[in-house]
Amino acid sequence: MNSADCRIFRISADASLREQRVLRKELFCSLRPGALPVIVDLSSLMGLNHDDIDLLLDCAALASGRDVRLLLVAGSRPNRVLLEITRLSSVLPVFNLLADALDSIARAKTFPAENAFASDPARPRSA
């Protein structure tokens, strides 16, 4: 898998307010209908604050109404727990590692019929 197959956004705790605004704008623009899959990588964060959660909720809402795949990389147990508490893990696929998210995209590209319901919240997730 190469970077041309998806867009990866790494959320950083030390980003300035200006950098956060630019990231938010680029992320929202990437969630246009029919766009490449988007991965939001939270693995560099020790925890999620309210701004991070707001961003993810907004992204989930945008992605749900469009034909675009949005995946999250929790990176840590505390992040995964917060994603479960906010119910984001019930509407978006959540992975522990970036490599796992990239593999999921590669599998969906190789076997599209098998992964047609990969974002269905009713399906159990093994990631």
Where are these regions (language model features)?
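Short, solvent-exposed coil/turn elements at secondary-structure transition points
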Residues: 14, 76, 98-100
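Amphipathic alpha-helical interaction surfaces in cytosolic regulatory modules
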Residues: 17-92
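Short linear motifs in intrinsically disordered/low-complexity regions
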Residues: 3-6, 42, 121
